[in-house]
Amino acid sequence: MTPFHRLSRFFRQAPSPPRTPITSNFPILDSAVKIEEERMPAFDRGLFYPVKLGDVFRSRYQVLSKLGFGANSTVWFCRDLHQHRYIALKIYIRSSEVNREVQVLKHLSSVKTNHPGSSLVRKMIEEFEITGPSGSHQCIVYEPLLTSLLHFQATLKPQSLPEDLLKGALQQLLLALDYLHSEAHVIHTDDSIFREWDTSEEAEPSPRKVDSSHTIYKSRPFHRKKGWSGFGMPLLSDFGEARLGDVHDGSIQPDIYRAPEVILGMSWTSKVDIWNVGALIWDLFEDHHLFDGRGPNGDHSDAHLLAEMIAMLGPAPLNFLRKAPQSRKYWDSNGRWKGAIEVPQCSLEDSEEYLEGENKKMFMQFVRKMLRWDPEERQSAPELLTDPWLIAQ
């Protein structure tokens, strides 16, 4: 061992002791009102690990506050007592099934690549299992991220990304998609912004519901400080629905972002993500969804969604429909729409409200390269990265 390494080991910081959590003077919420993960349609309290603020996992990760939740997990802001840094800890519900997200993240960790898009994909630090009252739970440790693009957008006035920021985000997203296909879009930041969350629980304890077996906390998401403008590259994250391989079957994607081939029961490839990018642009830039897809009762309807696609994109190509197992529910053998739903009077161009002239024309050409009925006609991520509108200053 060199003298330098002996010296660095001598000066290495010892692990920090766990902090004593707040045990009083926090807001108690009405036990009859459902909050957070309780509001998920298939919520089962017994499936979630009963995390408490102050808990320490693996003898090193102390829980400081709750960041968020989903149908299958909760996410916690933690202090790494060994390496004196902040991390995000995702704790999954109890399940006997192999966790798809863990599989994908392990695969990512094993990939050796110099592709620039790999740095734009969120990687896990480590994964482990813990045992709860009703079984085992898988856990993933990540670097914490500041916020999602959509939450960042909500802080803007008006609530739409400026064109230059949209272009930058799309370039990074497409570069990451060229390396790996995913859905969630988040903004990354350095460690300094997290320091005030370290002590925020002491200054303003999280509201919570408490009973003898389980405490449910209100999330404390990160927010930009007033006047703070420092943020890093957007990262792709959340691989819970990611797939390994090239061709798949089955239903995927949230209703309003679902690609035509998925709706019509066809096999699908990475081109479903290109469709997602095209649809997501409206959320980020136009401040509204491109498609609605709801019937008169407010519930999702594939027929209404397909009718909107016809209005926005034009008629579906006959050669595409002939490959779609479920197309005869909505079209006749000649490709004429026979759905009971009338095609609405709207267009893709009319739904874009901010651009004008040649710039709008170029933007619409860019979008139409992604929003194509036939996935084989959608451009790939590398092709889209050279689009004239995207690279124009």
Swiss-Prot record:
Active site: D190 (proton acceptor)
Keyword Cell membrane: no
Recorded catalytic activity of this chain's protein: L-seryl-[protein] + ATP = O-phospho-L-seryl-[protein] + ADP + H(+); L-threonyl-[protein] + ATP = O-phospho-L-threonyl-[protein] + ADP + H(+)
Keyword Transferase set for record: yes
Range of residues in the leader sequence: none
GO CC entries: cytoplasm; nucleus
Induction: Expression is regulated by the hypoxia responsive morphology factor A (hrmA).
Keywords noted in UniProt: ATP-binding, Cell adhesion, Kinase, Nucleotide-binding, Serine/threonine-protein kinase, Transferase, Virulence
Enzyme's top EC category: transferase
SUPFAM superfamilies in the record: Protein kinase-like (PK-like)
One example GO MF annotation: ATP binding
Ranges of residues in domain Protein kinase: 61-390
BP GO annotations: cell adhesion; regulation of mRNA processing; spliceosomal complex assembly
Short name of one Pfam family: Pkinase
EC code(s) of this entry: 2.7.11.1
Ligand binding (ATP): L67, G68, F69, G70, A71, N72, S73, T74, V75, K90
Role according to the record: Serine/threonine protein kinase; part of the subtelomeric hrmA-associated cluster (HAC) containing genes that alter the hyphal surface (such as reduced total chitin or increased beta-glucan exposure) and perturb inter-hyphal interactions within the developing biofilms, resulting in a loss of vertically aligned polarized growing filaments. Consequently, this hypoxia-typic morphotype (called H-MORPH) with altered biofilm architecture leads to increased hypoxia fitness, increased host inflammation, rapid disease progression, and mortality in a murine model of invasive aspergillosis.
Family of this protein: Belongs to the protein kinase superfamily. CMGC Ser/Thr protein kinase family.
Protein name as annotated: Serine/threonine protein kinase AFUB_078980
Origin species: Aspergillus fumigatus (strain CBS 144.89 / FGSC A1163 / CEA10)
Lineage: Eukaryota, Fungi, Dikarya, Ascomycota, Pezizomycotina
